[in-house]
């Protein structure tokens, strides 16, 4: 990846052109909600973390309402390693026993979330951290993982949940008070248990419930790639099904693309997978006409 651009070296006239290009997009998204799934390198490299914080602050300042749903897989793996426990995944989902769930809760709801909140606040924004347990935000139920090798059978992967319902009242209240919500993907079940929910799934469901104008999912790759490593810039539901069938989309990309497609089918107007390794990727996708990442379409 190329070295980051030194903005101080950009000529004033070019800066003005950049701002002028952003104006129609600011008008389009003014007053609208944009849900951002935040994860990957953008959460671990200091330069990218600071760039992301500034991006969401700018969106809020120009009247766009960002809602952040964050992951934290590498941080969870690191914490598990410290206690001598290895992470196990099935079909892109983390197997979560009781001990792992305790680690997930304090890593996501504590360390990772607070790092994001503090960074946004440090640069002049007003962020508030939530888990799905706060304000009854995310009602969850145990996820039954279909066993692909044994049709009709299911695999028990522990305290892994799926979204049963979302109560967006607390998120809307924060938006109305000019705050930026930062949400950890932990839900609560009627059985009294906490559930680890894939952050991509939470972001997609939340975008649908909030009637978001855009869902943006950040990854460590340029977007959805074909088997030859070429970027696929535009994918329909039929094309995605074919990529599932031939194994092009697999592992951790399975829940991401499934969630993106579900959101598109449920009325989210614009769904994009973007490369979070690119500095200011959020602003590039939302406020410029530059084609970026992969657009997911429902038809």
Curated annotation (Swiss-Prot):
Pathway(s): Amino-acid biosynthesis; L-arginine biosynthesis; N(2)-acetyl-L-ornithine from L-glutamate: step 2/4
UniProt main location, coarse: cytoplasm
InterPro entries to which the protein is assigned, alphabetical: AceGlu_kinase-like_sf, AcgluKinase_fam, ArgB, Asp/Glu/Uridylate_kinase, NAGK-C
HAMAP family in UniProt: ArgB
Function: Catalyzes the ATP-dependent phosphorylation of N-acetyl-L-glutamate.
NCBIfam families reported in the protein's UniProt record: argB
The protein's name: Acetylglutamate kinase
Biological source species: Burkholderia cenocepacia (strain HI2424)
High-level lineage: Bacteria, Pseudomonadati, Pseudomonadota, Betaproteobacteria, Burkholderiales
Gene: argB
């Amino acid at each position: 990846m190329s070295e980051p651009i030194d903005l101080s070296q950009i000529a004033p006239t070019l800066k003005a052109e950049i701002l002028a290009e952003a104006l129609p997009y600011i008008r389009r998204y003014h007053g609208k909600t944009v849900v951002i799934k935040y994860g990957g390198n953008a959460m671990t490299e200091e330069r990218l973390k600071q760039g992301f914080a500034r991006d969401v602050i700018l969106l809020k300042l120009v009247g766009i309402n960002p809602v952040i749903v964050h992951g934290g897989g590498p941080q969870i793996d690191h914490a598990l390693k410290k206690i001598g426990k290895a992470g196990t995944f099935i079909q892109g989902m983390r197997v979560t026993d009781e001990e792992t769930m305790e680690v997930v809760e304090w890593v996501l709801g504590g360390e990772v979330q607070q790092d994001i909140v503090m960074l946004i606040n440090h640069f002049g924004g007003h962020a508030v951290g939530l888990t799905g347990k706060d304000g009854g935000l995310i009602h969850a139920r145990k996820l039954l993982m279909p066993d692909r090798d044994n049709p009709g059978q299911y695999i028990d992967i522990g305290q892994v949940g799926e979204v049963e319902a979302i109560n967006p009242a607390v998120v809307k209240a924060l938006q109305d008070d000019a705050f930026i919500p930062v949400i950890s993907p932990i839900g609560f079940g009627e059985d009294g248990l906490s559930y680890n929910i894939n952050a991509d799934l939470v972001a997609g469901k939340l975008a649908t419930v909030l009637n978001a104008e855009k869902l943006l999912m950040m990854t460590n790759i340029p977007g959805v790639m074909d088997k030859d490593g070429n970027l696929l810039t535009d994918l329909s539901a039929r094309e995605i099904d074919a990529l599932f069938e031939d194994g092009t989309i697999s592992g951790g990309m399975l829940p991401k693309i499934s969630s993106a497609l579900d959101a598109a089918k449920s009325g989210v107007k614009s769904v994009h997978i973007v490369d979070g390794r690119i500095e200011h990727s959020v602003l590039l996708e939302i406020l410029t006409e530059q084609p970026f990442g992969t657009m997911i379409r429902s038809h």
